Swiss-Prot record:
One Pfam family from the record: Cytochrom_C550
Binding site for heme c: 64, 67-68, 119
One GO cellular component term: photosystem II
Cofactor note: Binds 1 heme c group covalently per subunit.
Principal location: plastid
Protein name: Photosystem II extrinsic protein V
Membership in a protein family: Belongs to the cytochrome c family. PsbV subfamily.
Organism, scientific name: Emiliania huxleyi (Coccolithophore)
Keywords on record: Chloroplast, Electron transport, Heme, Iron, Membrane, Metal-binding, Photosynthesis, Photosystem II, Plastid, Signal, Thylakoid, Transport
Location(s), subcellular: Plastid, Chloroplast thylakoid membrane
Length: 164
């Protein structure tokens, strides 16, 4: 029994050492091209700072990852946070400005109805407490994180359970 425990601990430690220290997302050694995302519907771009990306990741993990781990959507697996799905929404949500608007007052994928009572947002912060203290700067960082992830983890981001 002790041999199995030692083997398990050794395997976990080896996995952490091999994978944990080599991930570019973990080290956040991202070049300017990777940190450049679309700012608005006009095609303007913005280069996020490493600090904004770190902050966006931390805030996303705290407020969003319970339902959107890996860019998936647990409540509707057909609509992920990958760039293609975001671009096909109405209005398109494939830029920082539109994602910030969505986080303030979320709409259905077709843009027809508000879903603020069902989806965490600034508008529904009274029933989703994790949204209460988020500022516009926080929403900008979260949106930037969402748009940078496809460049960092490629098709894994929003790609489905086959990758996790």
């Amino acid at each position: 029994m002790a041999l199995k425990s030692k083997f398990l601990v050794g395997s976990i430690l080896a996995t952490f050492i091999l994978n944990g220290f080599s991930s570019p997302a973990q080290a956040l050694e991202l070049d300017e091209d990777t940190r450049t995302v679309t700012l608005d519907g006009k095609g303007n771009t913005v280069v996020l700072s490493v600090e904004q990306i770190k902050r966006g990741k931390r805030l996303f993990n705290n407020a969003c990852a319970i339902c959107h781990v890996g860019g998936l959507t647990k409540t509707n697996p057909n609509v992920g946070l990958d760039v293609e799905a975001l671009s096909l929404a109405t209005p398109p949500r494939d830029n920082v400005s539109s994602l910030v608007s969505y986080l303030k007052d979320p709409m259905t994928y077709d843009g027809a109805d508000s879903i603020a009572e069902l989806h965490p947002s600034i508008k529904s912060a009274d029933i989703f407490p994790k949204m209460r203290s988020l500022t516009d700067e926080d929403l900008f960082a979260i949106s930037g994180h969402i748009l940078v992830q496809p460049k960092v983890v490629n098709e894994k981001w929003g790609g489905g359970k086959i990758y996790y």
